């Protein structure tokens, strides 16, 4: 039996998006620069030669720069840890051979780090696409289960183009042999 047509697995990137790498790096650089300039204003000499702090009075400017620097470093650390732990990353698997749908995501470290939803394929009634345009556009593919429960499948972040979401939803509905709703 050919198992390549019986299993469909879609990888979900989660927090390891390019934008998260960008913002974590910018916040790390900016936060550490603010903190160094604030500390330099307190100590009275430049800790780093290319970040002069001679004209900055510690109270209030230097103190505020230290505060903003610490906030930037805390947010940057949070972003780097979510990237390291791959929070939100995982996969959507539809296995006709076993007759199950598995949705797996990584969470934050702890007791419930591994988040997994498993249900029989026969419980899937339809694939639904939600398109919301405007200031905050949302294009999401849902699996509708018996009992009108809906499980989102698409990743958070940049919305997919209309053609991409149409193609993904149609391929998934064709693979599962269920109806496609919501266009």
UniProtKB/Swiss-Prot annotation:
The cellular component terms of Gene Ontology attached to this UniProt record, alphabetical and capped at eight, are: chloroplast thylakoid membrane; photosystem I
Subcellular location as annotated: Plastid, Chloroplast thylakoid membrane
Membrane disposition: Multi-pass membrane protein
What are the BP-aspect GO terms? photosynthesis
Sorted UniProt keywords: Chloroplast, Membrane, Photosynthesis, Plastid, Thylakoid, Transmembrane, Transmembrane helix
* Signal peptide (residue range): none
Principal location listed in the UniProt entry: plastid
Q: Does the keyword Transmembrane helix apply?
A: yes
Q: Where are the transmembrane segments?
A: 21-43, 58-80
- NCBIfam families in the cross-refs: PRK02542.1
Task: State the family named in the UniProt similarity comment for this chain.
Answer: Belongs to the Ycf4 family.
Q: Tell me, what does this protein do in biology?
A: Seems to be required for the assembly of the photosystem I complex.
Its protein name is Photosystem I assembly protein Ycf4
**Organism expressing this protein natively:** Nephroselmis olivacea
């Amino acid at each position: 039996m050919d198992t390549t047509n019986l299993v469909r697995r879609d990888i979900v990137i989660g927090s390891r998006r390019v934008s998260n790498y960008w913002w974590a790096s910018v916040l790390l650089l900016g936060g550490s620069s603010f903190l160094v300039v604030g500390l330099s204003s307190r100590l009275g000499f430049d800790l780093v030669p290319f970040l002069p702090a001679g004209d900055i009075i510690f109270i209030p400017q230097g103190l505020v720069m230290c505060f903003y620097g610490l906030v930037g470093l805390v947010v940057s650390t949070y972003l780097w840890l979510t990237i390291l732990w791959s929070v939100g990353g995982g996969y959507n698997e539809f296995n006709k051979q076993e007759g199950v749908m598995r949705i797996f995501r990584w969470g934050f470290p702890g007791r419930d780090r591994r988040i997994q939803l498993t249900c029989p394929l026969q419980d899937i009634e339809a694939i639904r696409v939600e398109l919301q345009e405007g200031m905050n556009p949302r294009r999401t593919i849902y699996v509708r289960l018996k009992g009108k429960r809906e499980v989102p499948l698409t990743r958070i972040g940049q919305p997919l183009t209309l053609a991409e979401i149409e193609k993904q939803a149609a391929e998934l509905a064709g693979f599962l042999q269920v109806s496609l709703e919501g266009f």
